[in-house]
């Protein structure tokens, strides 16, 4: 009965917040939403073997997913040429107020001395309520997973179109509506972190440094942190299994590591970086921003290092610069697929959206809210997937039979 009431409450909150969000989006339909994808690097470090997955079940695996209307992913918002003057004027402004906080997020689950084993931090934008709901009710559910305490936060800035109205009072009105919606969502789920900077692609670096500072202050004893985008699917059981032998007091940052990536000098590119901003021929090694994991010790060290490194407009490259300052090398792992699962040339007919692939991975990037729901149900439903290999192959996260 309690479970039924909780599901009914979640459905009602989803409908109310979704309806309010739809009305506001309709009123602000000319505004553009920021894109939070990572730059495509050139060259990869050699991967290490994937740890075998362990079957696990998250709460409410049988719950019906909410209906998503028009859930086809929208194309990325076009980004104009790099604005030199604006970047140079604002690049040293790195402190913005926290408008919505969750100060008690990491105080355990009521047990004395309780602390999260894993904090999930998801980059999101105000308009992306559907994906936040999908994450909350699937792989990002809070509670105990395989005995580990998991907590969750979403990282947001002020909506890009909130203050762009023709008159000041129109822009301020939209800003007030957005903040009211996010406060209602925060009261319902206690997982929203909102800062006062504009939520744009080039401000993702601000989101990075503000989260590191927040986690160091409000989650000082967290063992591990997973940080990723809202359009990823995470196999939390595999992630916890990978972390089980690791010491949170030792340095660790693991993910889809990109090495020898060269700055893009083409002005039309979203990732265009002029030589005046970065003059070296290649970036330091960095983990793709779609999803990576770090230890509590590395969290605190990064928070300090990133406060001293000059801001850079691409967030995951900036984090690589902070790691370089600490003389830390990110650890590559083949089960972090921040560029999705490539279609094998030898089997063009094979579907890569297959639970038998996903159950052996940790992170897959680039899914819609409906895809996240569907894959979670396929993996954690009452029967589970019927796969040819009951255990993952040792050579990598998956392979195709010849």
From Swiss-Prot:
Q: Which Gene Ontology molecular function entries are recorded, alphabetically?
A: hexosyltransferase activity; UDP-glycosyltransferase activity
Q: One Pfam family for this entry, by name? A: Galactosyl_T
User: Where is it predominantly found?
Assistant: Golgi
Where does it localize?
Golgi apparatus membrane
Q: Which UniProt keywords apply?
A: Glycosyltransferase, Golgi apparatus, Membrane, Signal-anchor, Transferase, Transmembrane, Transmembrane helix
Q: How does it sit in the membrane?
A: Single-pass type II membrane protein
Q: Mind telling me which residue stretches traverse the membrane in this protein?
A: 11-27
Which regions of this chain are Cytoplasmic-facing, per the record's topological domains?
1-10
Under Enzyme Commission nomenclature, its number is 2.4.1.-
One cellular component (GO) term of this entry: Golgi membrane
Where is composition skewed (Low complexity) in this entry?
32-47
Topology, Lumenal side: 28-402
Q: Where is this region: Disordered?
A: 32-83
Q: Signal peptide: which range, if any? A: none
Q: Which GO terms describe its biological process?
A: poly-N-acetyllactosamine biosynthetic process; protein O-linked glycosylation
Give the family per the record.
Belongs to the glycosyltransferase 31 family.
Q: PANTHER family per the record?
A: BETA-1,3-N-ACETYLGLUCOSAMINYLTRANSFERASE (PTHR11214), UDP-GLCNAC:BETAGAL BETA-1,3-N-ACETYLGLUCOSAMINYLTRANSFERASE 9 (PTHR11214:SF91)
Supply the name of the protein: UDP-GlcNAc:betaGal beta-1,3-N-acetylglucosaminyltransferase 9
Q: Which organism does this sequence originate in?
A: Homo sapiens (Human)
């Amino acid at each position: 009965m309690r479970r039924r009431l909780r599901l009914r409450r979640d459905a009602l909150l989803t409908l109310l917040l979704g309806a309010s969000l739809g009305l506001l989006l309709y009123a602000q339909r000319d505004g553009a939403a920021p894109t939070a994808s990572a730059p495509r690097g050139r060259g990869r470090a050699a991967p290490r073997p994937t740890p075998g997955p362990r079957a696990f079940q998250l709460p409410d695996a049988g719950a019906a997913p909410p209906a998503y209307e028009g859930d086809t992913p929208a194309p990325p918002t076009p980004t104009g040429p790099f604005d030199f003057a604006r970047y140079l004027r604002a690049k040293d402004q790195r402190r913005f107020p926290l408008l919505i906080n969750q100060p008690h997020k990491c105080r355990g689950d009521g047990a004395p001395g309780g602390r999260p084993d894993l904090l999930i931090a998801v980059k999101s934008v105000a308009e992306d309520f559907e994906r936040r709901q999908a994450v909350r009710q699937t792989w990002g559910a809070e509670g105990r997973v395989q005995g580990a305490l998991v907590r969750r936060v979403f990282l947001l800035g002020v909506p890009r179109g909130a203050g762009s109205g023709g008159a000041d009072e129109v822009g301020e009105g939209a800003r007030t509506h957005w903040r009211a919606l996010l406060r209602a969502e925060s009261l319902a789920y206690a997982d929203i972190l909102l800062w006062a900077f504009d939520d744009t692609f080039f401000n993702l670096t601000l989101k990075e440094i503000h989260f590191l500072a927040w986690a160091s202050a409000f989650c000082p004893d967290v063992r591990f942190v997973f940080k990723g985008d809202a359009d990823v699917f995470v196999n939390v059981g595999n992630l916890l299994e990978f972390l089980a032998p690791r010491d949170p007091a030792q340095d660790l940052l693991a993910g889809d590591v990109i090495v020898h990536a060269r700055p893009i000098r083409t002005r039309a590119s979203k990732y265009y970086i002029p030589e005046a901003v970065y003059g070296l021929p290649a970036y330091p090694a960095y983990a793709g921003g779609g999803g990576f994991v770090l230890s509590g010790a590395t969290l605190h060290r990064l928070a300090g290092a990133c406060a001293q490194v000059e801001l850079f407009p691409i967030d995951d490259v900036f984090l690589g610069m902070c790691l370089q300052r600490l003389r830390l090398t990110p650890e590559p792992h083949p089960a972090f697929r921040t560029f999705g699962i490539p279609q094998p040339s030898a089997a063009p007919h094979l579907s890569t959206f297959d639970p038998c692939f996903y159950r052996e991975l940790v992170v897959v990037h680039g899914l819609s809210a409906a895809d996240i729901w569907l894959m979670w149900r396929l993996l954690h439903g009452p029967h589970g997937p019927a796969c040819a290999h009951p255990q993952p192959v040792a050579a990598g996260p998956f392979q195709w039979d010849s």
